Amino acid sequence: MPLALYLDDCADDDTLAALLCQAGHRVHTPRQAGISGALDSDHLAYAVRHGYTLLTKDPGDFLDLHTHWQTLNRAHSGILLIYEEKEVSKNMSRVQIVAAIENLLASGIAVANTIHILNQWR
């Protein structure tokens, strides 16, 4: 089942967005929303308001936001984290990101109200 994905500022990339669309996902970016450069909390609120699962390369801040939202009993459509390595050659490629999302979805594990580290789904 394809996802409605919101790529935050850190993950906003035209090529990645195109690959995700080709894989059947609906993709929205901060540029399209007119909120580029907004606070991470605003990006998450936007994603929630519009039913998007958030995709980010800023795991630390969104782990904290997820925990904070849990304490407030607030729901979200899921947060997908990508950890970047100091050695750039070890970073996930755009194709690997799309494949990791497909692997996660194929597992049947719930996405809503959870955090998933895509690096583990390569």
Describe each PLM feature range.
Residues 2-4, 8-9, 16-22, 35, ...:
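Acidic, PIN/NYN-like endoribonuclease modules and their adjacent C-terminal/linker elements
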Residues 10, 14, 59-60:
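Alpha-helix N-cap/helix-start capping motif
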Residues 26-38:
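Conserved BB-loop
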Residues 40-41, 59:
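Conserved glycosyltransferase catalytic-site signature
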Residues 48-65:
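Acidic, metal-binding active-site segment of PIN/NYN-like and related structure-specific nucleases
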